[in-house]
Design a protein with these regions (language model features):
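Hot-dog-fold acyl-thioester-processing enzymes
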Residues: 1-94, 154-225
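HotDog/MaoC-like acyl-thioester-processing domains
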Residues: 1-29, 73-75, 93-174, 242, ...
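Hydrophobic residues on conserved beta-strands that form the core of alpha/beta folds
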Residues: 34-36, 142, 229-231
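Hydrophobic beta-strand-centered segment that forms part of the acyl-chain substrate-binding groove
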Residues: 61-115, 125, 214-249, 256
Length: 279
């Protein structure tokens, strides 16, 4: 298990991703596991993240924040020579977070990242990037990001019936610069989030919000109402074109919550998720 003594440089890694993206071909995922021990949280950075995602400023880490800490390790793995798919152009389909207990800003963390479960998708191939946070050797947080690489799919997707969105419990104005602001705190400087001209090269009419920002923004709306241990699943649907006006709706489902984010004018879905008590 390769052990990292410092956080990987994302600027250099994204440059590498652009230069090597067209040469990546493969059929197997690497079995590499990256680990970075003794990670401390920068309080200033945490506060900036809280403000961008609209979490309260506390000594407890938002449930989505460890994803940001592990993201450089994910990018390092996805830009290694043995990784079969290019980073640029991979689509974030879904994200699951399992929180066993809250994390505090003064705890020393060990980050661990690996990739698994390569499988067919109607539009190509998909795989799971697994991130873990351990404290004193005990796992306390797990994130599963499912990515799609388009091309050579297994068949056509089933047509989706149009479903009218629920009545929003809140309407949020998403500013045009949220992609750049979230990129500054997350390190995710994929060009589709930064500028409309760059986004058009990838088929988007305008820059789009990060999927993990939309998930974080939704979970910020639940602060003070969630248990200490829970699992939150999200499926990303249509992108949020910036600037935007979005509707947010939440409802109780069994013992947990269901929530949706959608275009406030057209009802086009951006995200659907559930929060389930327990881990």
């Amino acid at each position: 298990m390769p052990e990292l003594t410092a956080t990987p440089n994302l600027t250099a890694l994204f440059g590498k991703a652009v230069l090597t993206g067209f040469t990546r071909r493969g059929t197997r995922l690497p079995d590499t596991v990256y680990e970075q021990p003794n990670v401390s949280v920068d309080r200033t950075h945490l506060a900036r993240y809280d403000r961008v995602c609209e979490f309260r400023l506390t000594d407890e880490l938002p449930v989505t924040y460890p994803h940001v800490l592990a993201f450089p390790l994910q990018v390092k793995l996805m830009t290694d020579p043995g990784f079969p798919f290019p980073l640029i152009g991979s689509v974030h389909l879904a994200n699951r977070i399992i929180r066993i207990r809250p994390l505090r800003v003064d705890e020393r963390l060990t980050l661990r990242v690996h990739v698994e479960n390569l499988r067919d998708h109607a539009r190509g191939r998909q795989f799971d990037m697994i991130s873990e946070v351990l404290v004193a050797g005990e796992p306390v947080w797990t994130g599963v990001s499912t990515y799609l690489r388009r091309g050579g799919g297994s068949g056509a997707e089933k047509a989706r019936e149009r479903v009218e969105p629920p009545e929003p419990t809140a309407v949020w104005r998403v500013p045009g610069n949220i992609g750049r602001r979230y990129a500054e705190v997350s390190g995710d400087r994929n060009p589709i989030h930064l500028h409309p001209l760059a986004a058009r090269l990838f088929g988007f009419p305008r820059a789009i919000a990060h999927g993990m920002w939309t998930k974080a923004r939704c979970l910020a709306a639940f602060e003070g109402r969630l248990p200490e241990a829970y699992t939150v699943d999200v499926r990303f649907k249509l992108p949020v074109l910036l600037p935007a006006r979005t509707g947010f709706a939440a409802s109780t489902v069994d013992q947990g919550w269901g929530f949706e984010l959608f275009d406030a004018r057209t009802g086009r879905p951006h995200l659907a998720g559930t929060v389930t008590p327990g881990a």
